[in-house]
Amino acid sequence: TIARATNQLNKPWCLNVFVDNSGVIDFDGENAICFKVETHNHPSAVEPYGGAATGLGGVIRDILGTGLAARPIFNTDVFCLGEPDMSYDELPPGALHPRRVFKGVHAGVADYGNRMGIPTVNGAVLFDERYTGNPLVYCGTAGIMPVWAAKPGQQSPGDLVVLMGG
């Protein structure tokens, strides 16, 4: 597995992998970079805006919960959706039209990230009929933290986290 291979390599710049809310690597000896991605497919198929927004919110939360809290610095996304020109007659029963899903997931990810003040720096969109009714909505966030704060399990009850969006 990827986890086993990474652990066998035992690189000193891999500070926190497969044990906390996100993977952390040493960037320059003083700063560490962390990254987390996940999918939010079914929720986005049912309610595109909310499903995608909460998918992005989950990875932002995981960055904040890594070690002693990283600062989110950017978001990324990949959307795989059904063909946008599909006729409504071709839709499976209960499926939303791919155009509606696309507009909703795009707006959900954009709104959530923008309101938090975290830019989306890249993304991709793939249209294929196989994603009709079952989109792939892949969201990710990167963060930065001091190397000393990258180890898991150092939080204490009563610690406070303050996050303000714009």
Where are these regions (language model features)?
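Long, structured ligand/cofactor-binding scaffold of large enzymes
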Residues: 1-166
